Amino acid sequence: MRKLLQIEKPAQRRRKSEAGFTLVEMLVVITIIGLIMALVGPRVLNYLGESKSKAAKIQIESFSSALDLYYLDLGRYPNGNEGLAALTRGNNAPGWNGPYLRGGVVPNDPWGHSYIYRTPGERAPYDIISLGSDGQEGGSGTAADITSAAR
């Protein structure tokens, strides 16, 4: 009996060695990515929550500056019925030199809720309040209320 010699071509050898990743290699990579996300993910979400709180504080400061300009022009702060909308439309009030907010619109807080304007305020002529991420009074963390009285 004769044995035939099989000669393997170099192109065939190359294809076998370049077959791709094994299942074990893929599982190791997916596990490593999962561990990294488990460690980094909560920190990123925490930074996002903190940045929304900071943005709300900055917007409240902007409203306070606009209300001070309104007061200088009209000699009073808007009443509870007028609210923050008085900063965008004058209602034919003598001395009104607005709009006092850019864009002519009162923006919502970073969580999409309306700001609350109360007059008289607790320790000032007015209070501006963002109810935080939960949209309800009270709370802690990102759900904590942010007020102009805290400035």
Indicate residue ranges for each PLM-predicted region.
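A residue-level signal for beta-strand positions that form part of recognition/binding surfaces
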Residues: 20, 98, 125
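Short, surface-exposed interaction loops/tails
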Residues: 2-7, 50-54, 61, 65-69, ...
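Conserved hydrophobic/amphipathic alpha-helical signal-anchor segments
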Residues: 18, 42-92
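N-terminal leader/signal peptides at the extreme start of proteins
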Residues: 1-21
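N-terminal single-pass transmembrane signal-anchor helix
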Residues: 17-44
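Short, structured beta-strand/loop micro-motifs enriched in basic residues and often containing a Trp
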Residues: 94-100
